[in-house]
């Protein structure tokens, strides 16, 4: 039986469309590539540098002042460098040989427990359900940490940045929203289980909302 290499982003395709997920892993048929905006990647880089400067000073950044006295920034720089890497990240392999890895943005530490912190850049203020789109990703990160022997809290944080205004000197100001969400390890386990089951079965039906499958069906007439 073939084994597979998963990541939170590749597993998100399972929810979007089981057929596209099956084709991607079993037939190496991928969605057409599109231009990826560079701004989120640039923001991610400068935010990590910003947080690392605060970590070296042993202080929390202004965006996390509401957590003062409760947590500190994870300060194992070498380990954090590995866990942030898209080529390494936090890894785990199941007994069948299926491999999953994920690259985190940052970690907070509360006593002996870790708390995953992820940065998100948006163009607009949050909606009521914005954080729900990232629950699977955060559950998988926590699952991986626990599989590697680290205790994590039963919650995680998303730190959202969205543009607010441009000052007279040209500096762009961002508002921030810190959102605390509950961790569900069982959800991560179920995602992995379903992923393997789908890939080991026949090609599934496409999602009704999948624009790629709709496009293909129209091409085929």
Regions found by a protein language model. Give the residues of each.
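Short acidic (Asp/Glu) and glycine-rich catalytic loops that position anionic groups and cofactors
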Residues: 26-32, 120, 168-172
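Short, solvent-exposed loop/turn segments at secondary-structure boundaries
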Residues: 128-132
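An active-site-proximal "capping" alpha-helix that borders the catalytic cofactor pocket
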Residues: 134-146
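Short small-residue beta-strand/loop micro-motif enriched in glycine and branched aliphatics
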Residues: 32-34, 124-127
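Metal-dependent nuclease catalytic regions and adjoining charged, substrate-binding loops involved
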Residues: 1, 5-6, 146-221
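Active-site ExK catalytic segment of metal-dependent nucleases
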Residues: 103-109, 115-124, 137
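Accessory terminal regions of nucleic-acid processing enzymes
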Residues: 20, 27, 45-48, 56-57, ...
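Metal-dependent nuclease catalytic cores that hydrolyze phosphodiester bonds in DNA/RNA
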Residues: 1-109, 113
């Amino acid at each position: 039986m073939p084994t597979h290499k998963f990541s939170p982003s590749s597993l998100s395709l399972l929810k979007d469309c089981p057929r596209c997920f099956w084709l991607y892993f079993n037939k190496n048929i991928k969605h057409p590539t599109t231009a990826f905006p560079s701004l989120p990647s640039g923001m991610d880089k400068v935010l990590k540098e910003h947080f690392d400067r605060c970590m070296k000073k042993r202080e929390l950044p202004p965006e996390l002042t509401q957590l003062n006295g409760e947590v500190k920034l994870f300060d194992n720089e070498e380990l954090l460098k590995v866990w942030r890497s898209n080529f390494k990240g936090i890894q785990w392999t199941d007994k069948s040989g299926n491999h999953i890895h994920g690259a985190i943005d940052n970690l907070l530490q509360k006593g002996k427990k870790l708390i995953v912190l992820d940065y998100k850049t948006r163009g607009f203020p949050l909606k009521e359900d914005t954080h729900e789109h990232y629950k699977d990703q955060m559950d998988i990160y926590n699952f991986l940490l626990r599989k590697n022997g680290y205790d994590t809290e039963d919650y995680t944080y998303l730190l959202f940045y969205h543009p607010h205004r441009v000052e007279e000197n040209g500096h762009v100001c961002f508002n921030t929203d810190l959102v605390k969400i509950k961790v569900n390890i069982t959800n991560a386990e179920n995602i992995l289980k379903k992923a393997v089951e789908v890939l080991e079965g026949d090609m599934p039906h496409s999602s009704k909302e999948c624009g790629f499958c709709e496009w293909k069906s129209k091409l085929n007439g």
